Structure formats: C-alpha cells, structure tokens
C-alpha cells in the first residue's frame, strides 16, 4: 500500500485533522505523554499556528488549526512529538509499547527504530462557518460518543471547556 496521498487543499486556511498513533496504540493514558503534546502545541502557537479546537484521546487527537504553512507545521509537530514521546517511553522503560511501535512501522521507515504516528493526518479544509461549527462539535463530542464522559466539558484534554467560557489547558482561537 502506498503512502498517504491526503493533501492540504490550501495550507494557509483552517483544516480539520486527525493524528493517530501507529496501530492505535493507547499512549496518551498518562498525563506526562499528553503534556508533551501540549508543550508542542504551545511552541507551535508561539510560532504563529492558530488552534481552533482539539481533543486528545488515548490513541489519537483531532485538531482544527491554521498557519502560514500548515502542512509543514504539522509535519514539524509530528516529528518533534514523536521524538519526545519515544524518548519518554525509553526513559520510563515502557518496552511493550516500544516493541509494538517497532513491529508496526512502515518498511520505508528503515532509518529509525520506531515509527510513532500513522502517516498522514487526513486534512479537511474548513469552508465556512457551518462546517467549522460542525467539526468543533464533532471534536468536542468525541469523548461523549465513546462513553468516557457524560458532557463534553468534563473531558480534560479538550477545548470544550474553553468554548463553554471556562479555563482550558490550551488557549484557543475563537475567531475564524
């Protein structure tokens, strides 16, 4: 099977994306691993990325973001977080996950022992306010749909609290 052919239609506009851990391995079950993502988001936001909505679940995250070169910025985000997360797994001797990452990596990833993220992010261009609202609702209700919480604002690793006027873990851009 070939590499992902999903592309960013217009890399300067907001896109809905899904970033999934290889083989859907549940890595984001520890606050330390989620904090690596938040640190990386904050860095990218300081570099100019706008984050409109997000949710982090145990093995993937959904995101609506925009930057001047979103395709390149998401590639940087994935590369940096992969190195940090693999480093965390190694430092904490979480060998079962490391072995699984190694056994499921793509053949062309021969220059490194582990692949962390699945290829591609399935970017969808957000065209108009109705689509933006629909995607934000989808993102925020993901943990509810999975039965993890009864209300979207109860999921800690989501921008739902921010949209409800409460403090969230990441500053979100509400204007698009």
Enumerate the language-model features and the residues they cover.
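Short catalytic/metal-binding and nucleic-acid-binding patches
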Residues: 1-176
């Amino acid at each position: 099977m070939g590499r992902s052919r999903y592309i960013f239609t217009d890399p300067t506009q907001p896109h809905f994306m899904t970033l999934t851990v290889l083989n859907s391995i549940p890595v984001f079950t520890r606050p330390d691993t989620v904090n690596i993502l938040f640190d990386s988001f904050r860095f990218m936001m300081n570099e100019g990325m706008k984050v409109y909505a997000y949710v982090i679940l145990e093995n993937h995250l959904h995101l609506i973001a925009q930057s001047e070169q979103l395709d390149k910025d998401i590639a940087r985000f994935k590369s940096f977080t992969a190195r940090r997360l693999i480093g965390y797994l190694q430092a904490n001797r979480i060998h079962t996950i490391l072995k699984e990452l190694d056994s499921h990596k793509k053949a062309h990833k021969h220059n490194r022992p582990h692949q962390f993220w699945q290829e591609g992010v399935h970017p969808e261009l957000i065209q108009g306010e109705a689509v933006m609202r629909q995607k934000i609702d989808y993102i925020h209700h993901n943990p509810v749909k999975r039965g993890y919480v009864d209300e979207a604002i109860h999921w800690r690793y989501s921008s739902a609290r921010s949209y409800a006027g409460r403090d969230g873990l990441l500053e979100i851009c509400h204007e698009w």
